[in-house]
């Protein structure tokens, strides 16, 4: 799927930076088996992310880490993001954590609100099947169709839209203005999650070498929040299911910019190791009747 979706889009300027950064011939060729793990080195940012995982997930994921170690990988604990106490919310995913700390110029939400206002206007300008052309139009439509679109928060509106359209209203308030606070927040979030964040943790290999990846628990939402702020890739491997809820969870690898091929290599090697071992913590196959069957449309005449 990655091979099918990557590549620059001339209509989407954000994609142009990948030119020259992707592997020639695609990502499939980077797939590896468990033997590739020998002499690989991974870091565990325990205080940055792992402490927020529940004990059951910690136990399962650490069993997989032990498998990796047995396969020849080196595991280094304590490879922390230097600014994790500042940028990682202890209470779960929170993209306005900077404002909660009293610093809107250190909040991801500060620039997300502005970017959304401008980008949704650009997107709507190309649609031909609607008269809605701006965030103002969307907000007005939601108010006019409160029962189905959730314009008002509960109890003024419907409980299905408990907070109404608070995100839209917050974005609307910015009017898309990229002011000094916008640029301060953007610079802070990118710097503290990139060179002073993930990149710094990846540099904590033995003898001043770099790590092949950071191992993180992706059910801890702060992991992908930090990666998203940095614009860095994360890949998740199936790991297990919660005993009480039956909900699945995974083990994730985090890397720096343009390191998708590295993540594909190590994720495929770990998954091969899971299947080659006796561990129950791996991708589970469907067991329902007929899951291998394919529905084929049949045209009946007359």
Describe each model-derived feature in a short phrase.
Residues 5, 62, 163-302:
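Glycine-rich, small-residue loops and helix-cap segments
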Residues 1-59, 276-301:
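A short helix-breaking turn/cap at a secondary-structure junction
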Residues 13-24, 83-105, 206-207, 289-300:
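Surface-exposed intrinsically disordered loops and tails
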Residues 1-26, 51-86, 105-147:
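Acidic-enriched catalytic cores of C-N bond-cleaving enzymes acting on peptides and small amides
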């Amino acid at each position: 799927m990655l091979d099918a979706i990557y590549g620059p889009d001339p209509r989407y300027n954000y994609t142009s930076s990948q030119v020259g950064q992707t592997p020639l011939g695609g990502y499939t060729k980077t797939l590896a088996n468990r033997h590739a793990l020998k002499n690989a080195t991974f870091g565990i940012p325990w205080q940055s992310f792992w402490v927020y995982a529940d004990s059951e997930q910690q136990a399962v994921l650490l069993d997989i880490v032990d498998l990796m170690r047995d396969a020849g990988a080196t595991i280094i604990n304590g490879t922390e993001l230097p600014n994790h106490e500042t940028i990682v919310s202890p209470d779960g995913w929170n993209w306005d954590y900077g404002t909660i700390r009293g610093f809107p110029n250190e909040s991801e939400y500060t620039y997300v609100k502005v970017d959304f206002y401008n980008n949704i206007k650009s997107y709507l300008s190309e649609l031909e099947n609607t008269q809605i052309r701006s965030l103002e139009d969307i907000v007005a439509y939601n108010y006019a169709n409160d029962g189905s679109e959730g314009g008002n928060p509960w109890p003024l509106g419907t409980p299905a839209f408990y907070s109404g359209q608070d995100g839209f209203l917050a974005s609307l308030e910015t009017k898309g203005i990229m002011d000094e606070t916008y640029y301060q927040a953007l610079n802070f979030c990118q710097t503290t999650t990139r060179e002073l964040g993930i990149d710094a943790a990846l540099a904590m290999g033995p003898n001043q070498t770099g790590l092949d990846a950071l191992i993180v628990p992706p059910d801890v939402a702060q992991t992908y929040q930090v990666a998203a702020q940095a614009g860095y890739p994360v890949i998740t491997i199936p790991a297990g299911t919660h005993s009480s809820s039956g909900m699945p969870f995974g083990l994730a690898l985090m890397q720096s910019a343009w390191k998708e091929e590295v993540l594909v290599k190590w994720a495929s090697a770990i998954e091969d190791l899971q299947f080659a071992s006796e561990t129950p913590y791996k991708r589970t196959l469907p067991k329902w009747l007929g899951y291998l069957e394919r529905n084929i449309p049949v045209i009946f005449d007359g």
